[in-house]
């Protein structure tokens, strides 16, 4: 019995280091997301189409369309160690973008849970420039 316990303990120790280097993204409500975007060094990433972006986006947001054929090439140019606040219209595309970013090695990712729709419903500012 002691031998079995020792084998299990050693196996658990060695296998605990096998889980990948992924951190879960965090889904935030509009107010929390706004606070996150105002933190120093956080990059706000709008993954909607350019047409959606020009109709109204968060201040200082960078636009990279997750559904364009260039998304992976564009995110490859970004700093993987930076913190990103990612949003779209409803939260679906931003979650897809976050999953792709995780697969590319990004670890500090925050999602606007219900997208810019939630942001606007909360009365938070959008810009069109």
Language model segments and positions:
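Rhodanese-like catalytic fold shared by cysteine-dependent sulfurtransferases
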Residues: 2-8, 13-42, 51-83, 92-129
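Structural scaffold elements adjacent to functional motifs in cytosolic proteins
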Residues: 44-46
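Short, surface-exposed ligand- or partner-binding patches at beta-edge/loop junctions that are enriched
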Residues: 87
């Amino acid at each position: 019995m002691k031998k079995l316990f020792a084998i299990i303990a050693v196996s658990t120790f060695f296998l605990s280091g096998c889980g990948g280097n992924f951190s879960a993204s965090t889904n935030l409500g509009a107010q929390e997301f706004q606070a996150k975007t105002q933190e120093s060094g956080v990059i706000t990433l709008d993954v909607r189409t350019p047409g959606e972006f020009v109709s109204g986006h968060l201040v200082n947001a960078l636009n990279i369309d997750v559904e364009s054929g260039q998304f992976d090439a564009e995110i490859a140019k970004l700093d993987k160690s930076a913190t990103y606040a990612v949003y779209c219209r409803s939260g679906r595309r931003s979650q897809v973008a976050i999953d792709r970013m995780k697969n590319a090695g990004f670890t500090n990712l925050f999602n606007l849970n219900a997208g810019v729709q939630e942001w606007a419903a909360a009365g938070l500012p959008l810009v069109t420039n």
